[in-house]
Curated annotation (Swiss-Prot):
One GO biological process term: dUTP biosynthetic process
Hydrolase among keywords: yes
Protein name: dCTP deaminase
Similarity field: Belongs to the dCTP deaminase family.
First-level EC class: hydrolase
GO MF annotation, one: dCTP deaminase activity
Length: 188
């Protein structure tokens, strides 16, 4: 298994629609308009967060149950920024829509800009032949409110290509998150 370079990522996005919309260079903004970087990097792709957020609140239930999750536990926010309460979390989605090749596994890592502020990004691997918007989970590990910026970089995707194709892909299994659009809540 090997990690894929900027050239491979660019080719797969342009010729096979692996990432849409696709930014073929790393965008950092300018001195008077700084942004958290996004787009192609040397061995990955920095994704942006869309302006749709679901901020967790515990006013409706005392227990979080992934098999019976209460959608009322979230407050929907559409904004260029999202404020996450202390020791809480928010869900969002990527601006980008992904189509993962059959011989590729994609791993997501948080960006250091957020990690150094106590904001952790969690995303499970994007499996072979999965497609959709990526649902992002932001944990605010601090005792203060934390800010997330929409349409700026929030995490980096690393593409690992196997020496052989998998026998059964996510699409073949009929995965429950296949083709998801928007922020997607837990499914069982």
């Amino acid at each position: 298994m090997s990690i894929k370079s900027d050239k491979w990522i660019r080719r797969m996005a342009q010729e096979h629609g692996m990432i849409e919309p696709f930014v073929e260079r790393q965008v950092r903004g300018e001195q008077d308009n700084r942004v958290i970087s996004f787009g192609v990097s040397s061995y990955g792709y920095d994704v942006r967060c869309a302006d749709e957020f679901k901020v967790f609140t515990n006013i409706n239930s005392a227990t979080v149950d992934p098999k019976n999750f209460d959608a009322g536990s979230f407050v929907d926010i559409k904004s260029d920024v999202c404020i996450i309460p202390p020791n809480s979390f928010a869900l969002a989605r990527t601006v980008e829509y992904f189509r993962i090749p059959r011989d590729v596994l994609t791993i997501c890592l948080g960006k250091s800009t957020y990690a150094r502020c106590g904001i952790i990004v969690n995303v499970t691997p994007l499996e072979p032949e999965w497609e959709g918007h990526v649902t992002l989970e932001f944990s605010n590990t601090t005792t203060l409110p934390a800010k997330i910026y929409a349409n700026e970089g929030v995490a980096q995707m690393l593409f690992l290509q196997s020496d052989e194709e998998c026998e059964v892909s996510y699409k073949d299994r009929g995965g429950k998150y296949q083709g998801q659009r928007g922020v997607t809540l837990p499914r069982t």
